């Protein structure tokens, strides 16, 4: 039905349950859509997760582990404009205002994959999400983990929270 509206010139927004944005292409094909219909109908896909926001009243500065600092060095090279300022590393402490959780509220972490010609060709040939990720990275793609780590760098959430939500990362505390 969404494809019918799309062909009539209407923009369609939909929800699909996948682990990341790039898996949406595979999921749509697995649901029975022809690859050429996917590539002609989809402009971009976005994955999102909610992480808990550090309580501004009780968050406490801390020094990240070596593994985390090394991960940030790589991110700073890939996204220099985003990681230009000094980091604000905080950890959750807990107080009466946040009911001793260390967190108050939520914020989103996102990844957006744009379907350009190269990616469309890869979807047509049913390439894996890993191969698709290599292609979109050439155009500034940031995955959920990287966007979450940017939010850590900005002092909005903790590394532990991003790991909890975005999954295994190889940067767990030593």
Locate the predicted segments by residue:
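Short, flexible helix-loop junctions that flank or precede catalytic/ligand sites
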Residues: 2-174
